[in-house]
Amino acid sequence: MGQKVNPNGFRYGITKPINSVWFAEKQNYGDLLVQDAKIYKFFDKLVRKYQIGNTSIKRTKAQKVTVVLQTSQPAKLLGENGANIEKITQDLHKYLKNKSLDINLQVSLLKQPELNARLAAEAIAQKLENRESFRVAQKLVINDALRAGAKGIKTQVSGRLNGVDMARAEGYSSGEMRLHTLRQDVDFAKATARTIYGAIGVKVWISKGELLEGDK
């Protein structure tokens, strides 16, 4: 039987860059891995507010941590004269309970946010929380992605849709979506909509076409 695998994990190191880039000795590896997980969790909560499409972590031998945030709204994330990014850095230190950690937050512009699966999934989740139709929410995101140049897109929502007693999954797809072709540049993300009927899961797959050699 065929097994479903996360399209991102399937492509890491082959056609997708790895989000955490660092090396550690065996005795420190576990602590740094847990720290990475906490950093990702911290910025997951800020995705909607600042439209953060991707987060990556780099560490040097001197244990300097660089967190690169790709956002479609860099001015909002940075704040006036960088005041907001400084506050976020302080909040991150408190969250990690490590004020001595050398953390540097870098902000880069995310071009074509409509082709980012994470932002697309959060957009659908936000519409569901605002009591919009789950069908309309998915179709709007699909149309936006195709207009922005996506080769294919697939969406799925699952849970108590429209408040019915029995949970079910329903989705739409348009264009090409070859998940087993590693050359296919596929972005995948999940989000959760907290509604009065309970949690509704959202999944989005966006295909940007096939990668040629040297296009990683």
From Swiss-Prot:
Keywords: Ribonucleoprotein, Ribosomal protein, RNA-binding, rRNA-binding. InterPro entries: KH_dom (IPR004087), KH_dom-like_a/b (IPR015946), KH_dom_type_2 (IPR004044), KH_sf_prok-type (IPR009019), Ribosomal_S3_C_sf (IPR036419), Ribosomal_uS3_bac-typ (IPR005704), Ribosomal_uS3_C (IPR001351), Ribosomal_uS3_CS (IPR018280). PROSITE patterns: KH_TYPE_2, RIBOSOMAL_S3. GO terms for biological process: translation. One of its GO terms (cellular component) is cytosolic small ribosomal subunit. It holds the Pfam family Ribosomal_S3_C. One of its GO terms (molecular function) is mRNA binding. Residues 39-111 form the KH type-2 domain. It comes from the Bacteria. Belongs to the universal ribosomal protein uS3 family. Binds the lower part of the 30S subunit head. Binds mRNA in the 70S ribosome, positioning it for translation. NCBIfam families: rpsC_bact. Part of the 30S ribosomal subunit. Forms a tight complex with proteins S10 and S14. This is Small ribosomal subunit protein uS3. It comes from Mycoplasmopsis agalactiae (strain NCTC 10123 / CIP 59.7 / PG2) (Mycoplasma agalactiae).
